UniProtKB/Swiss-Prot annotation:
The name this protein goes by in its record: NAD(P)H-quinone oxidoreductase subunit 2 A, chloroplastic
TM stretches of this protein: 24-44, 57-77, 99-119, 124-144, 149-169, 183-203, 229-249, 295-315, 323-343, 354-374, 395-415, 418-438, 484-504
Top-level enzyme category: translocase
Swiss-Prot/TrEMBL catalytic activity: a plastoquinone + NADH + (n+1) H(+)(in) = a plastoquinol + NAD(+) + n H(+)(out); a plastoquinone + NADPH + (n+1) H(+)(in) = a plastoquinol + NADP(+) + n H(+)(out)
EC number: 7.1.1.-
Keywords: Chloroplast, Membrane, NAD, NADP, Plastid, Plastoquinone, Quinone, Thylakoid, Translocase, Transmembrane, Transmembrane helix, Transport
Species of origin: Piper cenocladum (Ant piper)
Principal subcellular localisation of the protein: plastid
Primary role: NDH shuttles electrons from NAD(P)H:plastoquinone, via FMN and iron-sulfur (Fe-S) centers, to quinones in the photosynthetic chain and possibly in a chloroplast respiratory chain. The immediate electron acceptor for the enzyme in this species is believed to be plastoquinone. Couples the redox reaction to proton translocation, and thus conserves the redox energy in a proton gradient.
Amino acid sequence: MIWHVQNENFILDSTRIFMKAFHLLLFHGSFIFPECILIFGLILLLMIDSTSDQKDIPWLYFISSTSLVMSITALLFRWREEPMISFSGNFQTNNFNEIFQFLILLCSTLCIPLSVEYIECTEMAITEFLLFVLTATLGGMFLCGANDLITIFVAPECFSLCSYLLSGYTKRDVRSNEATTKYLLMGGASSSILVHGFSWLYGSSGGEIELQEIVNGLINTQMYNSPGISIALIFITVGIGFKLSPAPFHQWTPDVYEGSPTPVVAFLSVTSKVAASASATRIFDIPFYFSSNEWHLLLEILAILSMILGNLIAITQTSMKRMLAYSSIGQIGYVIIGIIVGDSNDGYASMITYMLFYISMNLGTFACIVLFGLRTGTDNIRDYAGLYTKDPFLALSSALCLLSLGGLPPLAGFFGKLYLFWCGWQAGLYFLVSIGLLMSVVSIYYYLKIIKLLMTGRNQEITPHMRNYRRYPLRSNNSIELSMILCVIASTIPGISMNPIIAIAQDTLF
């Protein structure tokens, strides 16, 4: 009899929870319609994989790419709508959040065709790879719109767990296992530090978790200048620092870049930075509104260390992927300038513009590395010597993307850095911008060193990998080359027509 009553209570409680969830989805589902498309795509992937054979592999790629494109389309249709807060204050929809969501979706859309041939050649499990990519994308999108501390913690964990699994996808590779272990340990530690910072913020504000309510709570409790807020700021900066990977929180980055599968590195190198930057701007700008001088100082130190250490250590690298790892550490230093400048002086607009260009430059470079790695089995820089004589198209594409990363005119990277540094200079960050300009010159050196090797490799420099390199024609059915061409075009042409891109970025300011 007692068991029967308990069973009835359990059914009633479960029904209430289900009805509440259905009610929330029914009345608030339109606010997360792009995310719902991805969830539907994930369900379709699972259904097809469990009911079909290996002959339906093209359908898996088609469903993944289509769901991402449809999600982008849904975002574009929602453009310029009034800002809305949904799900009891947990999620916010506005243009600023949506453009970061657009950038994450764009990264994932370009990374899937970049991965097709690599997965086929390495015989990796396809369905799980696509599931992890879409789930990580979903976590990044929720992080961009997160409006309370719980969602800000849960969403990046969704992204991070998939990232750990993707980085260790080649289970038989010792380097991949080592990279995954370091990534997992560092990620777990950073999440713990972040939550500890949130607990100080929660207590100081009188038990508030929504970002704007935290500000009101700090005013009511008169705790906005208390030591507790300073402690919260330090812990949260460290926690976010591990996600953004500026120096000195970059220890995991080179090993993960070198040991993980190259398409995974391409995906993580851009999506993680876009999602973390979106979260950082909201956390620093809203709850720490009264501590702007303190977090500006902390971020300036991180930016200077990142630009100096990242670019100087990149000079000494012999692996292309490790070189790009340290290059990305330097690049995040430039992005932090935009975060510091903030809403005034077009700081966020310059950061968004540079991130858009960085996505194309970085993914284009990784597409070249994937192609070269599949054809030679190496990513050592010296093995690229003389590539122009064997494959002019791949050599020219690599050179254009590297030059754009270095910031040489008239490529997109130059105008992106120019806009970012100009906004920083107008905001009075003279020392920070000067360091950025100096380190940009240093970065041009090691990029040009690789380009020189590509174009003019001497006979004594050419390795057996290059001597055995077979000429490959430009094939329209090669998805990696398609991604590479799109990224190369996006790394060059937008530099000539900057005004429309800047205007769109300026419209995203909240």
